[in-house]
Swiss-Prot record:
CDD domains: cbb3_Oxidase_I. Its cofactor is Cu(2+); heme b. The gene is fixN. It catalyses: 4 Fe(II)-[cytochrome c] + O2 + 8 H(+)(in) = 4 Fe(III)-[cytochrome c] + 2 H2O + 4 H(+)(out). Heme b 1; low-spin binds at residues 117, 406. The keyword GTP-binding does not apply. GO terms for biological process: electron transport coupled proton transport; oxidative phosphorylation; respiratory electron transport chain. Belongs to the heme-copper respiratory oxidase family. Keywords: Cell membrane, Copper, Electron transport, Heme, Iron, Membrane, Metal-binding, Plasmid, Respiratory chain, Translocase, Transmembrane, Transmembrane helix, Transport. It is a multi-pass membrane protein. One of its GO terms (cellular component) is plasma membrane. Its main location: membrane. Induction: By low oxygen levels. This is Cytochrome c oxidase subunit 1 homolog, bacteroid.
Length: 539
């Protein structure tokens, strides 16, 4: 009987969660255990509905396809779902900043909803995109089925459980108060187990490959998986107050704690949001334009430069703090050095279109990927510039930093993920084309306009903030109180919410387009000017 082991494990887990809820040392841990119990119970019921009690027929149900794409399909759907959720929460957070009365105490105030937004976009949307695409890419480039059988399912569902536990924990107020590492110790332990399984599945597939060469995209994926594991374990070293309680204390304190946190925080950007998505760039752009990578040698140089330099750049988040000055300067120097290899990768991605530049005009998926690479180039110039101490003295703690982060996260990570989804969906579900190519074009313009409005407004707001904070009168007193600087941000915060709403509208359009494609629908529409005629809808 299929799924017997899985059902037993889920049932035991649900029972232990119930015991944990009953013996909890604090109210929050008890509430979280109830969340875990219902999540595992739901998983058990879903599996029970899929159980086939008939004996397996040799050679028929047991026959395996060449590639394990079912888990990739689930990953693509999860990426779209969590993306819409994350962007929606982001718009809510933006509106809360502009209109404080929208803060609903205690569960939906800004302090709890903001980490929900960042984690939903980075780890739920971005993480599912990376897991799904890495499983797809490693199988194709290795010419081998995903290693470990149902291990891929464990990685996928285990990661969804992590997302649910983290998100519910934020709303309950269970947090370590460490940016991008808010989940408490028991959620961190679960993610560690899932991540090790992810590494085993990915590395095992490479080791049993039939293709002698390891394609460069797999280098970037593997670097992302290994480095994130190291960062996660070290930064989340903590001592629980009780094994049946939600509270723990970090193994680090003071300046060491701050440095460890931003060693983790910046390299989460460097390896989660950069290396992993560069792997997507190096696979999906050549596939979509049907051209080889412009310079494979440059891609290898790009890889090793990123690996060596990025890990040192974290201290630039701690300029003008108690961190030793030499450490701040070290972070600044390595940040500036990162500019050149980052732009080398950008040039490599853009020049892959050599001989196919017309596709930017005729193929909105290519246009989306190219815009993503352009935002990558812009963000990797702006980041090193902001790490320079003189510039940082103005930009630090202002909304300029928020604009920088979103131009990278939405412009680079968001658009390259959207492009990958549009590439994958017709292939995974054996469709001739997407439901609507023109909707992709609309999505492109909504997303691009939303990012530009958001980032530009935050750049202006941040510079104004920095200048107001440092404005002194003739007697050496501050000209503006902090409350006045906050009040001055109101029009910018409203415009930011509008930019986020445009980006969300594009994501909703994508969700509809993807859903209709999965259902096998095709919209009868005129081709984009200059493009080849679209296949006619089936009768």
């Amino acid at each position: 009987m299929k799924h017997t082991v899985e059902m037993v494990v889920l049932s035991v887990g649900a029972f232990l969660a119930l015991v944990g809820a009953g013996l909890a040392q604090d109210r929050l841990f008890g509430a979280h255990m109830w969340v875990l119990f219902f999540a595992l119970l739901a998983g058990t019921l879903v599996l029970m509905r899929r159980v086939d009690f008939r004996p397996a027929v040799a050679g028929h149900p047991g026959r395996r396809r060449e590639y394990f794409d079912e888990v990739v399909k689930y990953g693509v759907v999860a990426t779209v779902f969590w993306g819409v959720v994350g962007f929606l929460v982001g718009v809510v957070v933006a509106l809360q900043l502009a209109f404080p009365e929208l803060n609903v105490e205690p569960w939906f105030n800004f302090g709890r909803v903001r980490p929900l937004h960042t984690s939903a976009v980075i780890f739920a949307f971005g993480g599912n995109a990376l897991i799904a695409t890495s499983f797809y890419v490693v199988q194709r480039t290795s010419r081998a089925r995903l290693f470990g059988g149902d291990l891929g399912w464990f990685v996928f569902w285990g990661y969804q459980l992590f997302i649910v536990l983290a998100a519910s924990g934020y709303l309950l107020g269970i947090t370590q108060s460490r940016e991008y590492a808010e989940p408490e110790w028991y959620v961190d332990l679960w993610l560690t187990i899932v991540w090790v399984a992810y590494l085993v599945a990915f590395l095992g597939t490479i080791m049993k490959r039939k293709e002698p060469h390891i394609y460069v995209a797999n280098w970037f994926y593997l670097a992302f998986i290994v480095t994130i594991a190291m960062l996660h374990v070290v930064n989340n070293l903590a001592v629980p107050v009780s094994f049946l309680g939600s509270k723990s204390y970090s193994a680090f304190s003071g300046v060491q704690d701050a440095l460890t946190q931003w060693w983790y925080g910046h390299n989460a950007v460097g390896f989660f949001l950069t290396a992993g998505f560069l792997a997507m760039m190096y696979y999906f752009i050549p596939k979509q334009v049907n051209r080889p990578v412009y310079s494979y040698r440059l891609s290898i140089i790009h890889f090793w430069a990123i690996i060596f330099m990025y890990i040192w750049a974290g201290p630039h988040h701690l300029h003008y703090t108690a961190l030793p000055d030499w450490a701040q300067t070290l972070g600044m120097v390595f940040s500036i050095m990162l500019w050149m290899p980052s732009w080398g990768g950008m040039i490599n991605g853009l020049m892959t279109l050599s001989g196919a530049w017309d596709k930017i005009r005729t193929d909105p998926v290519v246009r989306m990927m190219v815009m993503a690479v352009a935002f990558y180039g812009m963000a990797t110039f702006e980041g090193p510039m902001m790490s320079i101490k003189t510039v940082n003295s103005l930009s630090h703690y202002t909304d300029w930093t928020i604009g920088h982060v979103h131009s990278g996260a939405l412009g680079w990570n968001g658009l390259i993920t959207f492009g990958a989804i549009y590439y994958l969906v017709p292939k995974l579900w054996n469709r001739e084309r997407l439901y609507s190519v023109r909707m992709v074009n609309w999505h492109f313009w909504l997303a691009t306009l939303g990012i530009v409005v958001y980032a530009a407004v935050m750049w202006v707001a941040g510079i104004q903030q920095g200048l107001m904070w440092r404005e002194y009168d003739d007697q050496g007193f501050l000209v503006y109180s902090f409350a006045e600087t906050v009040a001055a941000m109101f029009p910018y915060y409203v415009m930011r919410a509008a930019g986020g709403a445009l980006f969300l509208a594009g994501a909703l359009l994508m969700a509809f387009n993807v859903t209709m494609t999965i259902l096998g629908r095709v919209r009868d529409e005129e081709p984009i000017f200059g493009a080849a005629p679209l296949p006619a809808p089936a009768e």
